[in-house]
């Protein structure tokens, strides 16, 4: 369908920072793909203070909505502001660096049926620092899967679609850097919203990567742990307390047998530390449960079962998954 600035079904949010070489090609590829689909759409381009002429070129394109930053704020800030400005019920995220299959954006919208978010799971790794990046991403993804108790094929793909009404509840939690995509996945899972995945091809990006391996990997790890601590602190702290308690208890048994019932100070310190961490975990979980906001937006799976707004929930309450 055609571009609509009034009441689009789909809003496509694209962060741009110094992408002048392939900007026109990517935007036209996105427009052609969406015009061939059944969805009315708008394209929101957020220029993150480009210095290569991207801003000036974007200002000449009449069929996009342009948001231009005066200072560089990061891809997370760009996508967050673009999503807040979106008018469509569905928001698509992608890039304009030739890495994602932007001609398949309508496929994401179709796959969203029955889900709150759909992520394009990359089948190959074509990024920079490949030798170090692949094992680092594998470790972070496995950590996220363990913390969230959910299978996650691709944790930090920037090619995704989601319901805007759900995302609006959590946009304030998104960091400004690259870890915002990880946050978007984790925050949906932590709050009971469904995330689906579709396999996509991933190409070597054009131009220079803005990814900083050491700094951004550290931020990914911190953000994954922070997200789970905000909604399930017992998942993080209980194993730590258990390990310390087992170590302390083993040392206690050793002291009682080997030292004529004299318990070492270090043994008591380990056991007490385990107890303190467990108490902190319980208190943190209590705070989370008391302060957890009541969702104003029901998950897609609940709505599909006829328990959405405006429906009688009296006889259906026991059917909630």
Residue locations for each model-derived region?
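Structured catalytic core of nucleotide-sugar glycosyltransferases
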Residues: 1-131, 138, 165-171, 183-190, ...
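Residue-level detector of alpha-helix boundaries and kinks
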Residues: 15, 67, 128, 151-152, ...
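Single, functionally critical "micro-switch" positions that shape active/binding sites
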Residues: 17, 51, 162, 240, ...
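Conserved catalytic loops of nucleotide-sugar-dependent glycosyltransferases that act on lipid-linked
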Residues: 74-79, 83-86, 99, 103, ...
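Membrane-embedded multi-pass helical conduit in multi-pass membrane proteins
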Residues: 233-315
């Amino acid at each position: 369908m055609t571009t609509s600035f009034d009441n689009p079904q789909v809003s496509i949010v694209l962060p741009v920072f110094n992408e002048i070489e392939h900007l026109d090609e990517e935007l036209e590829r996105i427009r052609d793909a969406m015009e061939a689909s059944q969805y009315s759409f708008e394209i929101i381009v957020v220029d993150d203070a480009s210095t290569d002429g991207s801003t000036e070129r974007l200002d000449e394109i009449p069929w996009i909505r342009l948001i231009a930053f005066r200072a560089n704020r990061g891809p997370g800030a760009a996508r967050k502001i673009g999503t807040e400005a979106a008018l469509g019920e569905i928001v698509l995220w992608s890039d304009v660096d030739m890495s994602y299959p932007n001609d398949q954006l309508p496929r994401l919208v179709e796959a969203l049926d029955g889900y709150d978010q759909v992520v394009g799971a990359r089948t190959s790794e074509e990024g920079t620092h490949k030798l170090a990046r692949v094992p680092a991403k594998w470790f972070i993804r496995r950590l996220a899967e363990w913390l969230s108790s959910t299978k996650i094929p691709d944790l930090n793909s920037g090619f995704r679609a989601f319901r805007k009404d759900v995302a609006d509840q959590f946009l304030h939690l998104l960091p400004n850097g690259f870890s915002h995509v990880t946050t978007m996945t984790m925050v949906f899972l932590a709050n009971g919203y469904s995330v689906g995945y579709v396999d996509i091809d991933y190409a070597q990006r054009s131009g220079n990567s803005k990814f900083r391996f050491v700094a951004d990997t550290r931020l990914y790890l911190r953000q994954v742990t922070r997200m789970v601590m905000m909604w399930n602190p017992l998942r993080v702290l209980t194993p730590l307390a258990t390990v310390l308690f087992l170590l302390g208890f083993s040392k206690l048994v050793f002291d009682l047998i080997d030292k004529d019932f004299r318990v070492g100070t270090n043994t008591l310190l380990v056991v007490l530390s385990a107890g303190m961490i467990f108490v902190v975990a319980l208190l943190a979980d209590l705070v989370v449960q008391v302060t957890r906001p009541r969702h104003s937006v029901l998950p897609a799976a609940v709505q599909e079962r006829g328990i959405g707004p405006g429906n009688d929930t009296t006889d259906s309450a026991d059917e909630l998954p």
